[in-house]
């Protein structure tokens, strides 16, 4: 059976960043605990799951505080080309777009995500020069305990 490739393109949730108690704390979950790795184990050996998570990544926004390198749109095409052929791209972005400094509504953020989807659909980074399929994911509610 041919291997299939899933690209997980996201922010700190995809990266596996542990919730920070202080701005200087930068811990990461063990690779086996990160959601792309868990998904890869569940899918089985015929799937290659690639985690492309970057803490603070926005959908399409240059961050005036953290830098323009946090803009997911700027990084997307190079990452798609790096991992071709891709069967499925999972987008898990938008959380950092909620920062007060951006002043975006949920509708605004959905339009930002749409720009990423269109960029993927217009790419030739899937099988046989086609576009990969796209799945939009959102993190579940997190309840902090302890």
Regions found by a protein language model. Name each.
Residues 1-54, 60, 78-81, 89:
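Serine-esterase "nucleophile elbow" of acetyl-processing enzymes
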Residues 1-2, 33, 45, 69-146:
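Alpha-helical cap/lid subdomain in secreted, periplasmic
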Residues 53-56, 136-138:
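A general secondary-structure junction signal
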Residues 15-18, 58-61, 98-100, 143-146:
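Short acidic/His/Gly/Ser-rich catalytic and metal-binding motifs that mark active-site loops
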Residues 21-28, 64-68, 104-107:
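Short glycine-enriched, charge-decorated loop/helix-capping segments at active-site entrances
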């Amino acid at each position: 059976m041919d291997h299939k490739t899933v690209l997980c393109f996201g922010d700190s949730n995809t990266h596996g960043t542990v919730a920070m108690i202080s701005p200087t704390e930068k811990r990461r979950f063990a690779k086996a605990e990160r959601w792309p790795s868990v998904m890869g184990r569940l899918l089985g050996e015929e799937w290659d799951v690639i985690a492309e998570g970057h803490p603070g990544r926005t959908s399409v926004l240059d961050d005036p505080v953290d830098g323009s390198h946090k803009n997911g749109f700027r990084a997307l095409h190079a990452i798609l080309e790096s991992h071709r052929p891709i069967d499925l791209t999972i987008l898990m972005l938008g959380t950092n777009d909620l920062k007060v400094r951006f002043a975006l509504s949920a509708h605004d953020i959905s339009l930002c995500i749409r720009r990423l989807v269109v960029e993927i659909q217009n790419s030739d980074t899937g099988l046989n020069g086609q576009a990969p399929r796209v799945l939009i994911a959102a993190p579940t509610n997190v309840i902090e305990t302890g």
